[in-house]
Amino acid sequence: MSVLIETTVGDLVIDLFVKEAPKTCENFLKLCKLKYYNFCPFYNIQHNYTCQTGDPLGPTGDGGRCVWNVLNKGTRFFKAEFNPSLVHNKMGLVSMSTATISSRDDKLLVCGSQFIITLSDNLEGLDERYPIYGQVAEGFDTLLKINDAICDEEGQPYRDIRIKHTIILDDPFEDPPDLVEPLRSPSPTPEQLATVRIGENEQIESETSEDKLQREKEMEAEAEAVTLEMIGDLPFAHVAPPENVLFVCKLNPVTQDEDLELIFSRFGKIISCQVIRDKETGDSLQYAFIEFDNKESVEKAYFKMQNVLIDDSRIHVDFSQSVARYRQYYNSNRDRKRSSSRSDDREYHRRSDGRYDRSNYRDDYRHRRKERDHRDDQSSFRNERFSNYYGDDRSYHKRRNTGNKNCDDHLRDKSPERRYRYDRRYRDDRYR
């Protein structure tokens, strides 16, 4: 006993609790068979709580009708069915919306066609008012999209979320005699079309071709600037040329810096005027840069000096687009920082790794030389003590060339008296 509901944001498969709520399930199945829910909007969407649908006109409708009223054989509503075993304890439970009518005994809860779907867990507070008759078996991603919809203060989404089709997968109930299933989905009525806010395929922000072209140009310029920064032609991607520099080209090769400065000085104070020349030959490249103290002077010169004849040559002026000066300044600062960093590194390594200059090395060498001499004195003292202890007479070492028979090949004393003075543990066997 299942129904497939196709919406504008995805599909939902609802399994019905036929045994626990038979009349409610029958009403829902027969309304789906009559295509009553087609084009019904989702409204009253409360984030992480519930969403409501089932009225063909949405929040402006009359609340909907039950299937027996649609077939002109019954009242508009029927009594709500509550089952104590069914509670709102998880996401995806389907319940009927109820209305309260007065009866002779007490107030009575009745149902029509509207239903709600829970969008969160542990909503037991709905048990006393909304009777459960089904649960979502598939399509929880669709529920998440409905839950995340952008809505107004009343919970109605700005972009319409509607039921497109309802397909019955299993129906255990017999159809009423007057129920005739339509051959096709009915077209929406004019009243339903009047409730449309933003359609499914409607663009929220329409972009003209001019805006799209402008956006593409900006993105392309941004990419080119980043590329120039990476290869080193620009100091940084968003660098802008100076506004107080005028570019002059098509100059006569004989035109000098002083000539241009004299001609353009009537438009304002000139900070610098430079004709660009070849680095090797010094010949003029026939263009120059003139830097004024303010932007207004550049604009005056631009409008007044276009195609003016200077030294039999008509010049062309424009606002400068060069950032070479910024690049030179950036490179000089970068090199200065690098050199400072390298000097700091050298100082750090000199102190931490024990690297000294030549003068310090000489001082340490002298210090180590004195220590070595002191060690030599101590070693001679130890040798003297050793000789006295073992009776090793070093005077025999002076008889290297005397041919003394009491000395061995190593000029050591080999007399019997000396041998017996050694400890027995170190005595050689050949002397026994």
Curated annotation (Swiss-Prot):
Enzyme nomenclature, EC number: 5.2.1.8
Domain PPIase cyclophilin-type: 1-168
Biased composition (Basic and acidic residues): 341-366, 373-395, 406-432
Cellular component aspect of the GO annotation: chromatin; nucleus
Keyword entries, A-Z: Isomerase, Nucleus, Phosphoprotein, RNA-binding, Rotamase
Residue numbers spanned by region Disordered: 330-432
Primary enzyme class: isomerase
Reaction catalysis annotation: [protein]-peptidylproline (omega=180) = [protein]-peptidylproline (omega=0)
Subcellular compartments: Nucleus
Factors inducing expression: Induced during the meiotic cycle.
GO terms for MF: peptidyl-prolyl cis-trans isomerase activity; RNA binding
Name of this protein: Peptidyl-prolyl cis-trans isomerase cyp6
Gene from which this protein is expressed: cyp6
